[in-house]
């Protein structure tokens, strides 16, 4: 798999890339513009220069990681509630059947939050910025 087609800097017409639009997840085409600049366009019409595409990808990654944190926290809460329900109705076993899953999901939440607390999941800052 490649992100940019090998002939992108020689081609004049748009080329399909191996990356998706950060706004709609549609396939991006890349087109060379004057002075060797690249412009990315999806089928819906979203158009981005390289710096806009990188910023959009970074924001998408961060949003997706936060969605993962929320989903895992909901899983921990649900499993905890199921454990409580089971124990109130005499169905709990020693160690609870969901304890391992709760511990794993809680650990994943901790690790994702550590990444997100570093400010950005991916640092795409260019030297001199």
Where are these regions (language model features)?
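Short Cys/His-rich "knuckle" micro-motifs
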Residues: 30-34, 51-53
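Cysteine-rich micro-motifs
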Residues: 36-48
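Short metal-coordination and nucleic-acid-contact micro-motifs, chiefly zinc-binding Cys/His arrays
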Residues: 14-18, 38
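Amphipathic alpha-helical coiled-coil segments
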Residues: 104-122
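Short cysteine-rich clusters marking metal-coordination/redox-active sites
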Residues: 21-25, 39-42
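Short, charged, amphipathic alpha-helical segments
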Residues: 92-103, 127
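Short metal-binding segments enriched for Cys and/or His
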Residues: 46-64
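Non-transmembrane amphipathic alpha-helical segments
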Residues: 65-68, 72-86, 105, 112
């Amino acid at each position: 798999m490649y992100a940019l087609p090998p002939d992108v800097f020689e081609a004049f017409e748009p080329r399909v890339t191996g990356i998706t639009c950060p706004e709609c997840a549609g396939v991006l085409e890349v087109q060379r513009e004057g002075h060797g600049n690249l412009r990315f366009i999806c089928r819906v019409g979203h158009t981005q220069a390289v710096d806009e595409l990188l910023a959009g990808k970074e924001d998408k990654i961060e949003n997706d990681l936060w969605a993962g944190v929320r989903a895992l926290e909901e899983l921990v809460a649900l499993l905890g509630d199921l454990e409580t329900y089971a124990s109130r109705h005499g169905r709990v076993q020693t160690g609870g059947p969901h304890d391992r899953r709760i511990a794993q999901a809680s650990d994943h939440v901790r690790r994702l939050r550590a990444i997100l607390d570093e400010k950005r999941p991916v640092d795409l800052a260019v030297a001199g910025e």
